[in-house]
């Protein structure tokens, strides 16, 4: 039950008026000045705080609902911003939400509820608790609150704001300070079946598509995939009615199937480019990991595209991942109006649809191909009890994304010659230039050169040319357009006056004054729409400057400042935080005093409520040193729990471990154990025994080399018996051995005339253990005969490769 506060009545006596004005906590929504304010007996007494004539703040102040929707969904939360364009500001304000055609003097006139974001900036009015006003009167340029949309059946709602700049300056609650939102039809499911009409618009129009993903654990908590949630890369195109990318009731192509199941846009882009005559622009935007982040952390993805009279439809899709085959997107959105113009803006909330190629019912269902393939259809809340969108009452599915398509320029001759904004004028200045959207993204060009002189030197038709350079072709399968462009022109010999005239655009609006206090300069520009046909130079001015005065009474101690920079990111990831912006001194005060203007500003910022994140964590520390000094190891980093998890368990990791790699460690030679000693090689007398070991690992990366692999030692069994017959046999063997050596030496001596050589030595050890080394052996002169020549009788040396295996 809501208690209505007693209405505050204003007396016309000066004493009570003086008391009422300082105590007022809000602006009035009445159109009368103070002298005409009647006593109010209604639910919210309207307290007038500002005197003077009402003024409309179409350019200075604005009331904006995030996403700029035209419709609201019952029960949905919307961020509302009230702002002033620099150098304007406001000290006080009042914000209310009324049903259409209601005065606000009854409780039931008000629609929805506001939610305070910053209690130091905003508060509910004490005498009108459904309205929001400032907490303290001071200079400000922006405030934000949340508005919770009313229940179904409320109808259209009007958000109204009033502004106080100074206590006796002005207030207003219409124009840019009024926002009308109508209730979204409960039967709306994102499916449209409107006929596609022939387009009668002229020229081309350029649009920007911005995709706002709202799919998060807060909005869709059931079975939300916390670790793999994402939107795939956006893929689509502007096309004619003869080509359909996808549509409800149709079957998914192979390209749509690969987007829906794999998140891959490659095949879809190939299909679109194959329809070259039916497609004007291929629309692409990068994927989003994770699916949702605040806009001050990650900007919403966007893409620009163009449309013309025959290709005035726009379609796109993106996969909701992970999912069986669920997507969101638009199909054949017509950007041409019945009045032969181009749509200014489209805002559409999106719900997921099923591509009909997989029969899974949950985000992470195993692959289950649908055989036979089914038609594309929107998901509903009654599809399956295990579905994350299931509602036994059959309610509508909460939208998972919003797409905003906004016209940013028009080119060429337009049927409707009245421009909607300055961008349209600027974009219409050079109709002879080709649309940049025709150039594939895989072709990187330099800028066009200036037009050359006309090829005709007489009063005759000729051609002029401009060029550009192809810097890179990223995909050789996609052809790149020409690097030269030609245009007809008239030679300079023409005497016709019209041949030397040039057509100019209208002047665009004046720039802001160059200073914030005192006398400064401002400028405006225009552009050459059509150069003289005779190829001569256009001499008409394209820029004008004039003096401007801002605050004539500013003192000599005032200083000139630059414009404010962009706001920093919010210092908090949830709840209340701070953000800052800065500016610099351009010129110090003329009287030599110190500049007292502020060079930095800080204001509070509101992130999603912290209860959606049960624990607040510090940033990750730096990675620790690797656990080893060489080779493969591990390293760690930590973060701390900054606040107690009072609203739930903190399941986030406080430590992370990853592998690290340092230069390889030296590997020493590895050997087997020694074998047993062999038997003595003699049966009597002196002999020897040996033992060996094998190399298991060659040394690597500078490791210790391999030691000996063979050892021998002496052995003596017993003295040999001196049997004469045996002794003679040994003498005979020794004699034959000496004779054999002599014959060998003589045969070797024949190879080197005049020399007797010793046998080759054994090969030396290899100079390297791996990677390729060398070995050497020698043959030395044993005896040189007198008849020998020195050049033919000398020591010999041989070299060979060894250990050629890699390290």
From Swiss-Prot:
One of its GO terms (molecular function) is metal ion binding. The keyword Glycoprotein applies. Residues 1-28 form the signal peptide. Residues 442-495, 501-555, 558-611, 614-666, 668-721, 754-806 form the TSP type-1 domain. Transmembrane segments: none annotated. One of its GO terms (cellular component) is extracellular space. Keywords: Cell adhesion, Disulfide bond, Extracellular matrix, Glycoprotein, Metal-binding, Repeat, Secreted, Signal. Disulfide bonds join 44-128, 156-182, 199-336, 200-340, 202-415, 443-480, 454-489, 459-494, 502-538, 513-517, 548-554, 559-595, 570-574, 605-610, 615-650, 626-630, 660-665. Residues 195-388 form the Spondin domain. Glycans are attached at residues 214, 448, 451, 507, 510, 564, 620, 623, 674, 681. It comes from the Eukaryota. It is found in: Secreted, Extracellular space, Extracellular matrix. GO terms for biological process: cell adhesion; negative regulation of amyloid-beta formation; positive regulation of amyloid precursor protein catabolic process; positive regulation of protein processing; protein processing. Highest expression in lung, lower expression in brain, heart, kidney, liver and testis, and lowest expression in pancreas, skeletal muscle and ovary. Not expressed in spleen. Residues 29-194 form the Reelin domain. Cell adhesion protein that promotes the attachment of spinal cord and sensory neuron cells and the outgrowth of neurites in vitro. May contribute to the growth and guidance of axons in both the spinal cord and the PNS. Major factor for vascular smooth muscle cell. This is Spondin-1. It comes from Homo sapiens.
């Amino acid at each position: 039950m809501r208690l209505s506060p007693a209405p505050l009545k204003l007396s016309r006596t000066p004493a009570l008026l003086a008391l009422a004005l300082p105590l007022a906590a809000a602006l009035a929504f009445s159109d009368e000045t103070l002298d005409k304010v009647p006593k109010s007996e209604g639910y919210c007494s309207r307290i007038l705080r500002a005197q003077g004539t009402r003024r409309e703040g179409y350019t200075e102040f604005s009331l904006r609902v995030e996403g700029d929707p035209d419709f609201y969904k019952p029960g949905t939360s919307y961020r509302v911003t009230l702002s002033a364009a620099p150098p304007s500001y406001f000290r006080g304000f009042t914000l209310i939400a009324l049903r259409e055609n209601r005065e606000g003097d009854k409780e039931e006139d008000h629609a929805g509820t506001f939610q305070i974001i910053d209690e130091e900036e905003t508060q509910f009015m004490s005498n009108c608790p459904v309205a929001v006003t400032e907490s303290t009167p001071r200079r400000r340029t922006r405030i934000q609150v949340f508005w919770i949309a009313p229940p179904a059946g409320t109808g259209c709602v009007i958000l109204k704001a009033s502004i106080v700049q100074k206590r006796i300056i002005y207030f207003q609650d219409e124009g840019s300070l009024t926002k009308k939102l109508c209730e979204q039809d409960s039967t709306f499911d994102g499916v449209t079946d409107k006929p596609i009409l022939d387009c009668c618009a002229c020229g081309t129009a350029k649009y920007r598509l911005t995709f706002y993903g709202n799919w998060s654990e807060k909005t869709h908590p059931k079975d939300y995939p916390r670790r793999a949630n994402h939107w795939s890369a956006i893929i689509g195109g502007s096309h004619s009615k003869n080509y359909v990318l996808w549509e409800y009731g149709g079957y998914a192509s192979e390209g749509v199937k690969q987007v829906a199941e794999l998140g891959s846009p490659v095949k879809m882009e190939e299909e679109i480019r194959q329809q070259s005559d039916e497609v004007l622009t291929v629309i692409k935007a990068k994927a989003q990991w994770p699916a949702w982040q605040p806009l001050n952390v990650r900007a919403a993805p966007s893409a620009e595209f163009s449309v013309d009279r025959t290709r005035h439809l726009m379609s796109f899709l993106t996969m909701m991942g992970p999912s069986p085959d669920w997507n969101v997107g638009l199909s054949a959105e017509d950007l041409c109006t019945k009045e032969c113009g181009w749509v200014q803006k489209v805002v559409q909330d999106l719900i997921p649809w099923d591509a009909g190629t997989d029969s899974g019912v949950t985000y992470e269902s195993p692959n289950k191909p649908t055989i036979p393939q089914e038609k594309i259809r929107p998901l509903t809340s009654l599809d399956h009890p295990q579905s994350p969108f299931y509602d036994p009452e059959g309610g509508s599915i909460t939208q998972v994304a919003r797409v905003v398509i906004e016209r940013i320029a028009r080119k060429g001759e337009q049927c409707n010659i009245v421009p909607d904004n300055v961008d349209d004028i600027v974009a219409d200045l050079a109709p002879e230039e080709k649309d940049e959207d025709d150039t594939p993204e895989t072709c990187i060009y330099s800028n066009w050169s200036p037009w050359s002189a006309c090829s005709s030197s007489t009063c005759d038709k000729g051609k002029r040319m401009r060029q550009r350079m192809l810097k890179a072709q990223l995909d050789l399968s996609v052809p790149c357009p020409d690097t030269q462009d030609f245009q007809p022109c008239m030679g300079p010999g023409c005497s016709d006056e019209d041949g030397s005239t040039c057509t100019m655009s209208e002047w665009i609006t004046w720039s802001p004054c160059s200073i914030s206090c005192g006398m400064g300069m401002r400028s405006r520009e225009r552009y050459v729409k059509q150069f003289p046909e005779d190829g001569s130079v256009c001499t008409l001015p394209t820029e004008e400057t004039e003096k401007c005065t801002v605050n004539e009474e500013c003192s000599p101690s005032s200083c000139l400042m630059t414009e404010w920079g962009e706001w920093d990111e919010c210092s908090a990831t949830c709840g209340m935080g701070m953000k800052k912006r800065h500016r610099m001194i351009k010129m110090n005060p003329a009287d030599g005093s110190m500049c007292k203007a502020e060079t930095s500003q800080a204001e509070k910022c509101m992130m999603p409520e912290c209860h959606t994140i049960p624990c607040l964590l510090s940033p990750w520390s730096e990675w620790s040193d690797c656990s080893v000094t060489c080779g493969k190891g591990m390293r760690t980093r930590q973060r701390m729990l900054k606040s107690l998890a009072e609203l739930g368990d903190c399941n986030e990791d406080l430590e992370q471990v990853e592998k690290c790699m340092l230069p390889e460690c030296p590997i020493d030679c590895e050997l087997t154990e020694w074998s047993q000693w062999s038997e003595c090689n003699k049966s009597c007398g002196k002999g020897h025994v040996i033992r060996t070991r094998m190399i298991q690992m060659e040394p690597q990366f500078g490791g210790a080399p391999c030691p000996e692999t063979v050892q021998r030692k002496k052995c003596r069994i017993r003295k040999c018996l001196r049997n004469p017959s045996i002794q003679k046999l040994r003498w005979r063997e020794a004699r034959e051995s000496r004779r054999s050596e002599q014959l060998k030496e003589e045969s070797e001596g024949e190879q080197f005339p005049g020399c007797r050589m010793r046998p080759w030595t054994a090969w030396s050890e290899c100079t390297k253990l791996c990677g390729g080394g060398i070995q050497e052996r020698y043959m030395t002169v044993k005896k040189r005969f007198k008849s020998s020549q020195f050049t033919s009788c000398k020591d010999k040396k041989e070299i060979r490769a060894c250990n050629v295996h890699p390290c």
